[in-house]
Amino acid sequence: MSLDAFLALLVYALVTSITPGPNNLMLLASGVNFGIVRTVPHMLGISMGFLVLLLAVGLGLGAVLTAFPALHTALKIAGGAYLLYLAWKIAMSRTLTGKGETKARPMRFIEAAAFQWVNPKAWVMAITAMAVYANAEHPFLSVVLIAVAFTVVNLPSVSVWAGFGTALRGFLSDPVRLKWFNIAMGVLLAATLWPMLK
């Protein structure tokens, strides 16, 4: 991969990793509701889960989904259902941790990693990266370089969202503001399904 192509890949990785989507909206809400320290496993799960998804797509999973459209459809339905469930949980959350009794908890590492497999934006990012930046002459090396680019860019990008959420904790310590923030985050998370439904 040429230096120009690798730099373009880094820009693609940055833009797709830092723009709003299911992961970043959930991290914003998690930062608000649980703080940055308790959100770290969620952030790491996103980064590692996406890395595994990216490698799987680069090593042939994307071709399998193209060959079996029913599997792709089933994955979209499962992902959509799980995304709606998460949106509901966020929308119904009413208490900041440390501010009273709550059963709410941040997403665990393994849950965040597994979510990447049903996250529509993650699939689009992975398939597009491999289709555009993978080199047919050096397939394995180009897949590894794409994975490295996303690994370098993804964790700092998603951390921005969790950090911003944590910065909002003081403002959202008012229960009414927190209620409406969580409802808005739940609705926005559900709205990320719209491109998948087209």
Report each predicted region and the residues it spans:
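Flexible cytoplasmic inter-helical loops of multi-pass small-molecule transporters
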Residues: 92-107
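Hydrophobic alpha-helical transmembrane segments in multi-pass integral membrane proteins
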Residues: 54-58, 117-127, 187-198
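A short amphipathic helical element positioned immediately N-terminal to and/or at the very start
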Residues: 109-117
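Hydrophobic/aromatic residues within the transmembrane alpha-helices of Major Facilitator Superfamily
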Residues: 14, 18, 51-52, 88, ...
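Juxtamembrane transmembrane-helix termini in multi-pass membrane transport proteins
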Residues: 3-73, 125-146, 151, 162
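Selective transmembrane alpha-helices of multi-pass membrane proteins
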Residues: 66-95, 154-157, 161, 171-198
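Short loop-to-helix capping motifs
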Residues: 21, 35, 119-120, 174-175
